A protein has these predicted regions:
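Short linear motifs embedded in intrinsically disordered, charge-biased segments
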Residues: 1-205
Length: 205
């Protein structure tokens, strides 16, 4: 079997370091192509902004965030995704330099969550779906698996597991408690909404 540094699986790029940079870059490229192909939609005088944003969400943003629930996100990757989204939204609203608009007002006018919050929401929706699966499910076992042994010295890499565990610490829940809550879909949605609201308010401080 050939040893490769990265490969594509189910539309996502997997690299040997477990990072998501290559996949995020590819997703932005595909989303940009999708956005440019719909240029006539964005320039249309007959379509309302609301309809344009809905088309953006289903035809561009869906391409951009495909598989985002399992991304190993960093401040840099989040920023790249957000910059692309903001650029698209400004073009849809026909806002060009020297005209300016704050990000918060831009998101409010287009009914958007920040990229960070959107990805966190998708991630925890996926976690809830996974925790409702059979205990024999490999995906569920991998998600809740607790690796043993000592880690290497130095600053630990920012992995998907550490990102999830940081959110768990914020909510003050362990896997056993989350597995119980996940069985109640309404309760799970409330938990995810509360987490996103908490992180949003902290970001504004």
């Amino acid at each position: 079997m050939e040893n490769v540094e990265s490969f594509t699986y189910l539309g996502s790029i997997i690299d040997e370091q477990g990072g998501s940079d290559a996949d995020v870059k590819a997703r932005i490229g595909k989303a940009r192509t999708a956005f440019l192909q719909l240029k006539n939609i964005w320039n249309s005088k007959q379509l309302s902004t609301n309809i344009k944003v809905r088309i953006f969400n289903t035809n561009v943003k869906a391409v951009l965030l495909y598989g985002a629930e399992t991304w190993r996100t960093t401040t840099t990757t989040i920023k790249k995704v957000q910059v692309f989204i903001n650029s698209c939204l400004r073009k849809i609203l026909n806002i060009h330099r020297p005209d300016t608009i704050s990000n918060s007002l831009l998101w409010e006018r287009t009914n958007q969550l920040s990229a960070e919050e959107e990805i966190r929401k998708r991630r925890w929706k996926w976690i809830g779906h996974t925790l409702r699966k059979s205990s024999n499910c490999i995906t569920r076992q991998a998600l809740t698996w607790n690796p043993e042994g000592k880690r290497k010295r130095g600053r630990p890499k920012n992995t998907l597991r550490r990102i999830i565990e940081a959110d768990m610490k914020t909510m003050n829940y362990n896997w056993t408690e989350l597995e119980r809550i996940a069985q109640d879909r309404v309760g799970w949605r409330m938990l995810v909404s509360g987490l996103c609201s908490f992180t949003r308010s902290n970001r504004r401080k």
